[in-house]
């Protein structure tokens, strides 16, 4: 309602990544007590959205202790997340992606592990929260920097590291994020063909035309781009039509369903065929058996990723 609209405008006005206003980058005190004005507005908007999901539409008079508690929890989570990112208190692990026919290594996907989830824990909940709360851009930039450092470290000892970094669709909608990313990449000329990007479909991209312009900028700099989680969301084919990408990673659920549902192989075959017609290379996820690898090869999937070829780990 009107309350959410007002707070959305407040977040936009305070956020240096929105509109034509460019303010200093938002900061957070690492003692866990303070948020920037922009992040405070984001916390309010996130809490209101969650509150309205369980309480329906409401007015200021409806903001009970339940909402206040939710808001405080959201603020604390944002502070903790930004502190984790600022201190680099997370680990990048790498999972191999190989040629499905020759099994030759093509590149690795860089994945994150947070201390809270353990070495093998999924970061899904924390990443989803960061996207919904509007603070995912900070993490994406930190991850890009960490992977670039890994590539450079390998180069110094004669090791060729090729890696893909995930970028949230939400990040691609932030002008500040885009400018920060491009500034970082301008200093990476020697390793540009070693670094590629995966655009995740976990968060809907509203302005596909603007997002595609970002991808074109990445292409101009010499980076390949992959559309991740293809088929996971309702807008998958809309993304494929609007975004100029070099690779498509078919969501793992379709790989698994190829062997568990009557029409699973038909859907997977159709996806692979469509991408081949568009001259886009494909990656199949969740490859855990030779049977799956053989089928992917038969239907024209180019690359494979999964436990059959290696678990996420160090390089």
Where are the language model's segments positioned?
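Catalytic core regions of nucleotide second-messenger enzymes
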Residues: 9-26, 119, 155-161, 189
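Catalytic strand-loop-helix junctions within cyclic-nucleotide turnover domains
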Residues: 18-40, 66-69, 96-102, 114-118, ...
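Catalytic core of bacterial c-di-GMP phosphodiesterases, primarily the EAL and HD-GYP domains
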Residues: 27-34, 104-109, 135-210, 286
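EAL-family c-di-GMP phosphodiesterase catalytic domain
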Residues: 49, 101-104, 114-119, 168-175, ...
